[in-house]
Amino acid sequence: MDVKNCWYREVCPKCPNQCGPTCLRYIEMLNLVQQSNIPESKWVPLKLRPGVDRDAFLELQDIKENIKSWVAKGNNLYIYSDNFGNGKTSWAIKLMLAYFNEVWAGNGFRRRGMFFSVPEFLDRSRELMNNRDEEFVKLRQDIIDCDLVIWDDITSTELTNFNHSILLNFIDARILANKANIFTGNVDYEGMAKNLGGRLSSRVWNNSKVVEFKDQDKRGVYNG
């Protein structure tokens, strides 16, 4: 990521003429994002239009404005919609970036937030049985202690027993440790129970604030 795309370019008085890659704020924030596993294409948050989801956006904005205490309390959030492409993942990442903005100062090299596409996470976990990926092993080791984890698209498919065991172990451990999680999916509780099973769906749904989006697919029509 080039410094010209810095997260603070619209509010920092040094941007663009006096800013450079040695800026401490930029370096700390970049390190947090690089360690988070957020896809680089999503490092800069979209400006989202609420449409019919105004009330849902206001709920999420309230969490965003209090994100540091929200994470410290070990809260959980499930953002879902029957429709695709209406901002669920974008909002989850927006909240994580807001948290990074609150904790960057003096953070050093500590990993504070992690993003996982659940289907990819499960595929890579299964591949570990035959091919040890040291980078992914390290990511998995940090899951339990990390402040905030995004579990994106958690309800995408019915879990096998193997995949169910993996997810349940990690999510159960985080909830018991009072660690914050953000889940996204495309099903309500009934669909979640079908895909995740009763035990895991109970952990996710009953321990989370549930926010539903109803707008249609808006990919390509966001303002920014």
Predicted regions and their residues:
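A short, basic N-terminal segment
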Residues: M1-N66, V210-V211, D215, R219-G224
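Short glycine-rich substrate-engagement loop in P-loop NTPases that contacts/grips substrate
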Residues: R54-Q61, Y80-D82, N86, Y99-D145, ...
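Conserved catalytic network of the ASCE P-loop NTPase/AAA+ motor domain
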Residues: W70-V71, G106-G108, Q141-I144, D172-A177, ...
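Walker A/P-loop nucleotide-binding motif
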Residues: V71-I93
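Active-site signature of alpha/beta-hydrolase-fold catalytic machinery across serine-
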Residues: K94, A98
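Loop/turn-to-beta-strand initiation segments
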Residues: R112, D145-L148, A177-F183
